[in-house]
């Protein structure tokens, strides 16, 4: 096989269905329509998939432009195996509510952890107070 360097290897994947994981944790699924030398992507018929436990929900997003530096993972979806998932699809409202509850639970657990460490004389700096320079 003759492999092309860099993002040129993605040319073969144009017009195929892909899953894209972003740095902020979002998961996008759509058809790859265009790429450039910086790995910027244009996805068509895109949905944002939200997973909570064994359930998932899809939020339609349409055409989606993704800046290359925000892509963590890009993978082609096998259309034959796509429907063979153990996950249950639920409505957008239901999955958003479950996601909110999950995030609230994580936040409360993090606060408890920080308080416990503080009581023992330890402290962990919060991520939002750190400089990213």
Curated annotation (Swiss-Prot):
Keyword Ligase on entry: no
UniProt-listed GO biological process terms: histone mRNA catabolic process; mRNA processing; negative regulation of neuron differentiation; neuron differentiation; RNA splicing; stem cell population maintenance
Gene Ontology MF, one: RNA binding
GO annotations of cellular component type: cytoplasm; nucleus; P-body; ribonucleoprotein complex
InterPro entries: Lsm1, LSM_dom_sf, PTHR15588, Sm, Sm_dom_euk/arc
Subcellular location: Cytoplasm; Cytoplasm, P-body
Primary localization: cytoplasm
Keywords: Cytoplasm, mRNA processing, mRNA splicing, Phosphoprotein, Ribonucleoprotein, RNA-binding
The Sm domain, residue ranges: 5-80
Phosphoserine: residues bearing it: 123
Residue(s) carrying Phosphothreonine: 129
One Pfam assignment: LSM
Summary of subunit composition and partner proteins: Interacts with SLBP; interaction with SLBP occurs when histone mRNA is being rapidly degraded during the S phase. LSm subunits form a heteromer with a donut shape.
Family: Belongs to the snRNP Sm proteins family.
Function (record text): Plays a role in the degradation of histone mRNAs, the only eukaryotic mRNAs that are not polyadenylated. Probably also part of an LSm subunits-containing complex involved in the general process of mRNA degradation.
Protein name: U6 snRNA-associated Sm-like protein LSm1
Organism: Mus musculus
Gene label: Lsm1
